Amino acid sequence: MFFNFKKYFLIKVFFFVLILTLCYGLYLYVKINRFINGKVWNFPTSIYGRIVNLEPGNSYSQKEVLHLLKSTMYRKVDLVMLPGEYSIKNNTIEFIRRAFDFPDIREDEFHARLYFNKDTLVKIKNIDNNHDFSFFRLEPKLIAMLKSPEAKKRMFIPRNQYPEMLVKTLLAIEDKYFYEHDGIHLSSIGRAFLVNLMAGRTIQGGSTLTQQLIKNLFLTNTRSILRKINEIYMALILDRFYTKDRILELYLNEVYLGQDGDEQIRGFPLASIYYFGRPINELNLEQYALLVGMVKGASLYSPWTNPNLALKRRNLVLFLLYKQKYITRKIYKDLCKRSLNVQPKGNIISSHPSFIQLVCEEFHKKIYNPIKNFPGTKIFTTLDYTSQNAVEQAVKIEIPILKRKKRLKDLEVAMIVIDRFTGEVQALIGSSKPEFNGYNRALKTRRSIGSLSKPITYLTALSQPEKYHLNTWISNYPLSIKLDSGQYWTPKNNNFSFSKKVLLLDALIHSINIPTVNLSINIGLKKLVDSWLLLGISKKYITPLPSISLGAINLTPFEIAQVFQIIGSGGYKSSLSSVRSIISDDGKVLYQNLPQSIHIESSEASYLTLYGMQQVVKSGTAKSLGTIFKEFSLAGKTGTTNNLVDNWFVGIDGKQIVITWIGRDNNHTTRLYSSSGAMQIYKRYLQYQRPVPLVLKAPNNINMFYINNLGELFCKKNNQHNRMLPIWSIKNKKICNDKLSERFSIKKKKNFLFWLKNLF
């Protein structure tokens, strides 16, 4: 009787435990199913640089295209066979462009050969079909990945796009019975149990890849019997209801492979980019071995922090491949001789923090929601890697030189590079240490702009062709102006010299203060303020005082860039932008920037002002720049404020406008003039970013005239006329002083034929 009772009791307990186990298994199945069939990961927002469009006739030199390829980690080889490889022969570059999901369409690999003639791309040939191409684009560089809510970064690649050599290496080291077991491997568990029992502590694991995946996706790192039971049970469920390739795909994209600051590097695709700078399918076997070796302990075997341990671990992986007959002894020996050859930490995905701040600000304005609500988005920006690199190199070289010369420790800098016509921001830094994230002076620092304000005064005057031309005389007498406060303001020239009068153009070329103030008084303070407002400066930053003509207005480098974009493009405003398009994680276009220009300033006055700025570089305050880059006809303007607190330079070539500011955060003197400070950084920039000649095309109402020493215009040259100026006038007949010129003469012979001609 007792025996039967015990028997029935045990049966009941058995079925109770069985039912409980099945119910718990059902719960785990639902949990796994919902997770894996749903959205497994929230990917971080990826930010890309500019997509480079190549067309025959582009002003791209062979050297510049090589720099673009190297920046995206293309590898030089003798014979191009794989994506990401290139070769050079004479005036050609042959390479296979990687497949890439562009904002509008996915483009496959493309085998191309580019032909160059001097500094111009002349032909693009498709090697596969031997046809010429009229248009071709390079994949952009990944410049940043924004923080994800889970503090994990990854890039997803489907199982069929993983190289088989990587998969074989992983399985050989971590789970060689993966395709045979049912999620767990009992002999491995038993072996690990005995080893740990004998050691008295946990020193060996018996987990399969499936178990490791379960732990990464669902469990914690806490070591306990209960956690191990859950791990085994869930591994059995996962293996029963999902294919081996799906499990492997999840593992390859989930495994922990290092740290980037406070964020984890997850998955082989992103680890490949971080450590080697190239996609996972372009790596060599020894590089796969390093990554697979890091699975055991990414922190311990990090090639950045523990290179010797990482090398030993990599070579051990290679040895195991040799022992399992995946490679020969010779290959094993050869591969072990190779260095780790990893990229310096932060060298590949270098975020350019100042530029990224601008991108994020624009992102929030365009999308209207916090960035965390858009995981996995791709932001395609306007950042030109060549220009950004040139800016950073110029600052890293010149700022230490200037600090040593002036014995300063706290000299700061901001630079912004924009496309002259579209207003796209191609490069930006806000600190003397471009790689550090912090206060962005390019966007936030509001400083007196000094003589950078003068071109706006001359632009305002030249917008009135009935009154002002480049040959207009302006008073250079000392003056004192009584302000509304009752005080007197007495401007002075920099060299404390004065003269009776000076030509308007010469006052701009040599940045003379007194004529500029006199000109602002003559044109009227209201018109000058209206010009600033028209150029996009907020009224709250404008104080309507005569000193505004000499720079008594505080602006940011970003605002200054917008002002000179309008002047530099002939009076057309294109709002500055850093974002071209934003694509959601499912491929939908969330935002597309279509650059639009608004004609807000006189084309003639803008042309004349820009012409004057060309003469500044040719023979004025920026003459030393013009001497070095004479063939490029650059335009520019220096700007230095009182007590040498701030110094500025704006440089303009055929395609870019560059604003440079140097100052100190405590507003103390820099002991630098613009020509010896900001302009020197611009000079250095041009050594890394080859300028394009600035060729000005005069509007129809502007013609070139000769000028004599009295500033009088002539249509024909003689011994007294040694200078030519562009003049805006619809009534050309009333400009010239030539007595022999019938077309342009002021005093014409009014004979019958002349009268008859004018009658009709």
UniProtKB/Swiss-Prot annotation:
SUPFAM superfamilies found in the cross-reference section: beta-lactamase/transpeptidase-like, Lysozyme-like
Cytoplasmic side: 1-8
Catalytic-site annotation from UniProt: E174 (proton donor), S451 (acyl-ester intermediate)
GO molecular function, one term: serine-type D-Ala-D-Ala carboxypeptidase activity
TM regions (residue ranges): 9-29
EC nos: 2.4.99.28, 3.4.16.4
PANTHER family to which the protein is assigned, alphabetical: BINDING PROTEIN TRANSPEPTIDASE, PUTATIVE-RELATED, PENICILLIN-BINDING PROTEIN 1B
GO terms (BP aspect): cell wall organization; peptidoglycan biosynthetic process; proteolysis; regulation of cell shape; response to antibiotic
Ranges for region Transpeptidase: 392-684
Protein known as: Penicillin-binding protein 1B
NCBIfam families: PBP_1b, PRK14850.1
Keyword DNA-binding belongs to the record: no
The organism's place on the tree of life at top rank: Bacteria
Classification via Pfam families: Transgly, Transpeptidase, UB2H
Positions of region (Transglycosylase): 136-308
Subcellular location: Cell membrane
Pathway given in the UniProt record: Cell wall biogenesis; peptidoglycan biosynthesis
Keywords, ordered alphabetically: Antibiotic resistance, Carboxypeptidase, Cell membrane, Cell shape, Cell wall biogenesis/degradation, Glycosyltransferase, Hydrolase, Membrane, Multifunctional enzyme, Peptidoglycan synthesis, Protease, Signal-anchor, Transferase, Transmembrane, Transmembrane helix
Extracellular side: 30-760
Family: In the N-terminal section; belongs to the glycosyltransferase 51 family.
Membrane topology note: Single-pass type II membrane protein
Protein task: Cell wall formation. Synthesis of cross-linked peptidoglycan from the lipid intermediates. The enzyme has a penicillin-insensitive transglycosylase N-terminal domain (formation of linear glycan strands) and a penicillin-sensitive transpeptidase C-terminal domain (cross-linking of the peptide subunits).
UniProt main location, coarse: membrane
Underlying gene: mrcB
Recorded GO CC terms: outer membrane-bounded periplasmic space; peptidoglycan-based cell wall; plasma membrane
Reactions this protein catalyses: [GlcNAc-(1->4)-Mur2Ac(oyl-L-Ala-gamma-D-Glu-L-Lys-D-Ala-D-Ala)](n)-di-trans,octa-cis-undecaprenyl diphosphate + beta-D-GlcNAc-(1->4)-Mur2Ac(oyl-L-Ala-gamma-D-Glu-L-Lys-D-Ala-D-Ala)-di-trans,octa-cis-undecaprenyl diphosphate = [GlcNAc-(1->4)-Mur2Ac(oyl-L-Ala-gamma-D-Glu-L-Lys-D-Ala-D-Ala)](n+1)-di-trans,octa-cis-undecaprenyl diphosphate + di-trans,octa-cis-undecaprenyl diphosphate + H(+); Preferential cleavage: (Ac)2-L-Lys-D-Ala-|-D-Ala. Also transpeptidation of peptidyl-alanyl moieties that are N-acyl substituents of D-alanine
